[in-house]
Each structure stands twice: as C-alpha cells, then as structure tokens.
Amino acid sequence: DELKAMGVETVVSVWPTIDEKSVNFGEMAERGLLVTADRGNAIVMTWMGNTFFFDATNPEAQAFVWEQCKKNYYQYGIRCFWLDESEPEYGPYDFDNYRYYAGPALQCTNTYPVGYAKCFFDGLREAGETEILSLVRCAWAGSQKYAVLTWSGDISSTFRAMREQLQAGLSMGMAGIPWWTSDIGGFLGGQVDDPAFRELLVRWFQWGCFCPVFRMHGERSPWYEREQEYIGDVRQLTSGQGNEVWSFGDEVYEILRKYLFVRERMRPY
C-alpha cells in the first residue's frame, strides 16, 4: 500500500523451476505436472539446487502454479509478475530427451513461454483483473494473446549486442508484440568503472529512453566476495556493483538524469 501510494507497482519474479526439496515437489511429480525425461535423470538445472521445470504445456500444471502464486502473492496485492527463465533454459540441452504433456520436446519446446504466460494471464483474468501485463524473458507464436511484455534476456554488454537489440525490437513489433525492451547496458560483462562500458551505457540509455519499456537490469562487476560459499548444500550467490543511474560517476549521472526526465515527460503519452 505504501509503494502504491508512491505510484510504484511491485513486480514479483517467478521461476518455472521447482527444487526436489520443495513441499510441492512430491505432489507435482505424482500428478505428472513436471517436464520428464525419456531416459536418465529428469533434473534439468542445478543452479541453486536440483530443480525441475513445471510443464507449462499441461493445463493442470498451469492451474497448480497459479494457485501457489495466488495464495502467496496475489492475495497480498501483487498484480504483476516477472516470468523469468521462460525458454526454458535447460542444462544440458538434450531436447531429444525431454518430454512434455504436449509431446516430445523436439516438437514443442518453443511453445513453453506461451503456456507460461497463459498460466498467469488466465489466473489473473479469472481473479477479475482487466489490465494484465507479465514481464517474460522470451516469447513464441501465440504469446501475443497473453499480455506479454517481452525482454531480450541476458545479453552481452557490447555495442554489437546493442545494435542487435534494434533488430530484435523491430522484429518483435512486426510479430504483434508491442511491449518489448532490452536490458539497458546489457546484462553480462559491464564493469562500472570502465570508460568504454560507461560510454556504452550512456548510448544505450539514450536509445532506451524511446523504447516501449525503459528498464535497466544486469550484472555489474567487479563482484563482491561471498560471505559463505554454501548454506546447507546450496551454493550461494554473490552481489555485483550498483546499477542505479548514480552508480557510474557524476558525468554519466548527469546525462542519465536528463533522459530520465525526458522519459517522464513522455510518459502520459
């Protein structure tokens, strides 16, 4: 309520993964709500634990995941969700081994982000929401129907990557997805005190000011040392440098500040 009074809408990041230690894992596995493997172990990611993907092509799995988010977030006022990891990002990429409710992964994996977005769109609509928008890391044919705001994912902090975003944004618009953005400054490889990166950030920020969505997001180095490598048996993340507009020196800040106010003047339109 305090944030909303300030004009700020909180967005909660949701991953489509479930740890084998989760209280929900047993039920989801027994009911066939997870992506499975035709051979070997179905663990598809070991980042922050041994995790499995929920099967976004399965209507029952969609309903189950939404019910958890409704109970833990929606009922407390959250109305917008950030659907990360929506490719999904397998490790390893053995697409001939994974199987969905909709069929073998080789036939239907690209539809995963469509089902992921539909899960939240249908849930929010059934809850009575009429203005729905979900931030999603990728999209596919059909995503247009489910109120997606797509961004281009974990891209490099290079001028080449910035140039590629112009192409990507034009393609998304022609595909019927008007809400699109990229991580201003790129996501990977930006060093806060590197003059070359600061130049890239300024140019990207100037362009980003006129994109459909204006968003800074990314890992900024150098990284801090971990206080603990593991807690229990889960490897801990560390934190990078600040990514606020004032994190890159006074000269850069004055330029970014200028374009922040340009964007604010444009916002009513």
Range-by-range predicted roles:
Residues D1-Y269:
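Catalytic-domain carbohydrate-binding cleft regions of carbohydrate-active enzymes
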